[in-house]
Amino acid sequence: MKKFTVAALALTTLLSGSAFAHEAGEFFMRAGPATVRPTEGAGGTLGHLNGFDVSNNTQLGLTFTYMATDNIGVELLAATPFRHKVGTGATGDIATVHLLPPTLMAQWYFGDSSSKVRPYVGVGVNYTTFFDNDFNDNGKKTGLSDLSFKDSWGAAGQVGVDYLINRDWLIGASVWYMDIDTTANYKMGGVQQHDSVRLDPWVFMFSAGYRF
């Protein structure tokens, strides 16, 4: 009976308090699949070709979070480069675009430092850089060339939840909405074009995390 009591007390200690805490001063990293789903639109020539479309893409997502207090966190979202196909209803796929959207968030975690489940919300800023953008053969056949996109700054919002498995490990899910507005610069028949493009994606991530 004494051994059982000792074991029960040890288990209670393990399952309570800081055993599951997101605590002030703590740092943790999450990793998992992150999917970018644009809610796209375009102006100019691209906008008049009907059905402007940017494909979804999934890459490895990483988040790095520092807890300033038991409830306030600061998070950086990073990922391997996303690759999107761009097209219109009139032309089909015409180009491939690569981008990186690092996003810095200020977060509020609900509950307290003894909670195993920590829902959270966040607001912050997104910076998106575009690179290795090119028209495919289909785009080139229509007289398109020299594609580039202007880097973008915009606001971002987030909701998510962490489930704390033990003192070191957690699993989580998070959704971001990002304001990504850019300008597509290209030539059509040798004439320079500048079209406004709105990506404004939803980003979904399921992750496993480790706390340091």
Swiss-Prot record:
It is found in: Cell outer membrane. Keywords: Cell outer membrane, Membrane, Signal, Transmembrane, Transmembrane beta strand. It holds the Pfam family OmpW. InterPro entries: OMP/PagP_b-brl, OMPW. The keyword Repeat does not apply. GO terms for cellular component: cell outer membrane. Residues 1-21 form the signal peptide. GO terms for biological process: transmembrane transport. It comes from the Bacteria. Belongs to the OmpW/AlkL family. PANTHER family: OUTER MEMBRANE PROTEIN W (PTHR36920:SF1), PTHR36920. This is Outer membrane protein W. It comes from Salmonella typhi. The gene is ompW.
